[in-house]
A protein has these predicted regions:
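Short beta-strands within extracellular/lumenal beta-sheet-rich domains
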Residues: 642-653, 688-689
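Short, well-structured beta-strand segments enriched in hydrophobic/aromatic residues
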Residues: 558-559, 698-715
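Short beta-strand segments within Ig-like beta-sandwich modules, predominantly Fibronectin type-III
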Residues: 541-542, 680-684
Length: 730
């Protein structure tokens, strides 16, 4: 015909692209090769250890393998190769008919009919991700469980890539369906203090979406763990790796609290290395053959994490707001990713889960119910659903919106409602373009009717809703956008509230528990504080006649409150020490911070007369010659390349040992305090506050403070493995 035409040619290849030796994630026989070559030989050799010494197998960043590694600009409509398999051929032949494979160029073409393009891309991705789910994830997971072990791991989530092919698996929830935990990883500066809104793209390995890492990444894991019945609430994060030698226990504690308060309850610390020190691959290394000064301090952090993870396991996190997973929408057109909506909620202490549209299509699997003002998905009960701006949604979700709004569940679309249905089905013999377009028009009209009762709101309105209605665990006065909170409930009627300060300033104010948290079903619960670092309970004082608690929460520190319906009853909380010093009639002690707050005298400042000595970690505890110094000490100016232990010694007079407290306002980084030869423990986040009463004597006392640095300064002269320049040591 006359006019300008575009001619497409498509080619199938067995050996095209960058990853020609990869298994085909969509092909059952190809994935079976992995089991035959790796898993079966391990079982043959170690089967008596399976289920005991060997807990399971870990898939680290499995990928479809098309395109270049970690390419983030690989949406449909770009010139990349797309994966194919005989299984996929069969599925698409059933879905659209082999005679309609003429539509496949729409994977690349952006100038065609938008509805037809969205439908083809959704159909392709739905088939690809379902095959990956079945032939890779579920096949490997089933093998593991049949052999008495678990299957865990994570896919590439970086910068919202969890919904793409290439270096990921196309759909976060489907890609991990066969695993026993919902996994993620955080490496290389993805989550960093104060960088919630820092975003850039400078090429491979140099891109960052701070909003995704801080507000979506952790919640993907805890959400999948909660809504998928076979995961039993278990999530996992590979953590700490590749942050560089400058990462120490202070940053590691921030990262641990960051993910635990978001509900992640299992961790795989990355990375130990058997190579000779210094190994340039993905530092820091926690032991480093004895060269890392913070190894013992890291051990104390592991104890802290274990205690909190015990508290966020075998129950359910109480969340009443859900955000719709944006993965399917990313396949079909432009989409407002979830990060901004998530940030608006989380910065106002309104917690949320992220749920896929699959919960409406696979109701039996997810135990989905809609009734009495609630959307129930497995253990979770939501009264509000947030949908960012999508062009297309599935037919199952559109029907569910009508059902939810009729049942009293609030459904909010940000900015605009969707324009169409992405999985249109039509009873036309040849699925020709004209017939299909008419079917799409009818489906879109039906969708508009189903969404009629849902409300369109702005981000500004969402912020108001978050502050006024959706933040239903605690209220802060004054408000603060860096206090994070999670609410967890156990089967015995007890609960837990966990707060973390991710900001850089101490929060001074009042935290008021919601009435539904303190008194579920009208029955008041006892409120007890738990110091997870010291593993001690303490008294919590509420303002008379209210659920308000005055708090002072320093940066990178946490508060945990245990809510117990029967304070004498046994519960599933970890074994906790109660200190022996009761205050008045209380069965528990006050914290050292509470005692400082009550102190009305003038504290003594210990600035002068300190003897300082140093040693490398490998030489500890053989310190060198001492030098008299005053505090604050600026060792970094004298020895700019030193890393190791710094020891400060001083004799101090204590007249009232029973009330003696030492507060160290800052140190870099880990601190261990000795009084008269007795260690009073390791602390890793300032201010470092120690109760001296157990070791102090009236009169003269010998005080020793040992500070463990990072390895950053010692390693600053060694080039990194990428040949990139290093920043000046902090």
């Amino acid at each position: 015909p006359e006019g300008t035409w575009k001619i497409y040619t498509m080619h199938l290849s067995r050996n095209f692209g960058y990853h020609r030796s990869y298994i085909n994630m969509m092909n059952a026989k190809s994935c079976k090769i992995l089991l035959d070559a790796v898993y079966e030989p391990h079982y043959a050799h170690y089967k008596e250890m399976f289920g005991s010494t060997i807990a399971g197998f870990f898939s680290d960043e499995p990928e479809t393998g098309n395109g270049h590694i970690y390419e983030i600009e690989d949406k449909f409509g770009t010139m990349v190769d797309f994966p194919w398999s005989s299984d996929l051929f069969g599925v698409l032949s059933e879905e659209i008919g082999e005679e309609n494979f003429w539509k496949l160029p729409l994977l690349w073409e952006n100038g065609a009919d938008v509805d037809l393009t969205a439908n083809l891309r959704y159909t392709y991705m739905d088939a690809v991700t379902r095959l990956i789910q079945k032939n890779f994830s579920e096949q490997v997971g089933s093998w593991c469980r049949e052999h008495g072990v678990e299957y865990i791991g994570h896919l590439i989530e970086d910068d919202d890539h969890h919904s793409r092919l290439g270096s990921s698996l196309g759909h976060y929830f489907r890609g991990l369906r066969g695993q026993d935990m919902a996994g993620i990883d955080d490496i290389g500066g993805q989550v960093l203090p104060g960088q919630e809104n820092v975003c850039y793209n400078n090429g491979t390995f140099q891109h960052r979406n701070g909003m995704f890492y801080h507000y979506v990444l952790g919640k993907l894991a805890s959400s999948a763990a909660a809504i998928e019945p076979h995961k039993h609430g278990d999530s996992m994060c590979e953590i700490f790796g590749n942050y560089g030698w400058e990462e120490g226990v202070q940053l590691e504690k921030y990262l641990a609290d960051h993910f635990m308060v978001r509900g992640v309850n299992h961790y795989v610390p990355h990375a130990f290395t058997a190579k000779e020190f210094p190994d340039p691959d993905c530092p820091p290394h926690f032991y480093a053959h004895g060269n890392n000064p913070q190894y013992r301090h890291f051990g104390e952090l592991m104890k802290y994490m274990n205690r909190i993870c015990e508290l966020i396991t075998d129950g359910a996190h109480e969340v009443h707001t859900a955000i719709l997973y944006d993965g399917e929408a990313d396949w079909t057109g432009d989409v407002e990713r979830s990060g901004k909506a998530a940030q608006i909620l989380y910065d106002r202490q309104a917690d949320y889960d992220i749920i896929p549209q699959d919960v409406f299509a696979e109701r039996e699997f997810y135990h989905t119910q809609i009734a009495d003002g609630q959307l129930v998905v497995n253990t979770q009960h939501y009264n509000t659903l947030i949908v960012t701006e999508y062009h297309y949604i599935t037919e199952a979700f559109a029907k569910a919106v009508k059902e939810m709004t009729a049942a009293g569940v609030k459904v909010y679309f940000i900015g605009a409602k969707p324009e169409g249905i992405c999985d249109v089905t039509a009873d036309v013999a040849d699925m020709g373009a004209d017939a299909w377009k008419e079917a799409a028009r009818q489906a879109n009209m039906q969708m508009a009717a189903e969404l009629e009762q849902a409300e369109v709101i702005s981000y500004e309105k969402l912020a108001d809703l978050a502050a006024e209605k959706l933040a239903d665990t605690v209220t802060l006065a004054p408000s603060n956008d860096r206090i994070r909170v999670t609410h967890y409930e156990y089967g015995d009627g007890s609960g837990m509230v966990y707060l973390v300060n991710e900001g850089d300033q101490t929060y001074e104010g009042t935290v008021t528990l919601a009435e539904t948290v303190r008194k579920p079903a009208g029955k008041e619960r006892t409120l007890t504080g738990y110091d997870a670092w010291l593993n001690q309970l303490y008294s919590v004082y509420t303002e008379e006649g209210s659920n308000a608690v005055k708090v002072s929460l320093e940066p990178r520190k946490s508060i945990i409150w245990i809510l117990d319906a029967d304070s004498q009853a046994e519960n599933d909380t970890p074994e906790i020490e109660s200190t022996q010093k009761a205050v008045g009639e209380d069965r528990l002690t006050e914290t050292v911070q509470q005692r400082i707050h009550k102190y009305r005298g003038t504290p003594e400042t210990l600035a002068d007369g300190w003897m300082r000595s140093t040693c490398r970690s490998i030489d500890y505890p053989n310190f060198g010659a001492g030098k008299e110094v005053s505090l604050p000490d600026h060792l970094e100016e004298e020895e700019p390349l030193f890393s190791g232990f710094v020891r400060y010694e001083k004799k101090v007079r204590i007249e009232n040992p029973a009330n003696a407290i030492l507060k160290i306002t800052d140190a870099a980084e880990g601190v261990e305090l000795f009084l008269n030869g007795k260690s009073l423990g390791i602390q890793i986040v300032p201010s470092y506050v120690y109760d001296l009463s157990d070791a102090a004597v009236q009169g003269e006392n010998e005080l020793v403070i040992e500070v463990a640095t990072t390895l950053e300064r010692e390693m600053s002269t060694i080039p990194n493995r990428y040949g990139m320049p290093k920043d000046d040591p902090k």
